[in-house]
């Protein structure tokens, strides 16, 4: 395990300043109204990140396998009163964002979210599986941190490690720890330390 100091966690949101014409940012309410009205009912798949519509990336077989392994590992660890969600929207009002992370540990049962999406107060952990999306997933840490997501994992398939971001602040996560093959990742849900997950159980 290696520890990264806060000075090494300088992540920032995308800067659209190079675009030569004005951009329009959607509010979260506007985006949700568009979804409800069927604007995105075609083949296009988007989610809202920092007020912008961002196309969702297609998952290859390696990504899909790591996603399933991670879901199985988390499902065998979390306590009663929580559940693991897969590629479902979460709502981050303060960041005008409604991403759909690969995995999310949310409070309560599946049926609790029939008419709403989990918000940061409902969420213990967000996980993104990263291969070609590694740079974007690292930048997205800034949104998760500012929005109040307690812990963010990046399952980094490029370097075969899991990056664990914690201690969120408006400027980003204050802590990052990297876990490598042969190590185990401690799992904390709702402030309670649970058993660890072996990295080898997550990486394909």
Where are these regions (language model features)?
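Gly/Pro/Ser/Thr-rich low-complexity, intrinsically disordered segments predominantly at protein N-termini
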Residues: 1-204
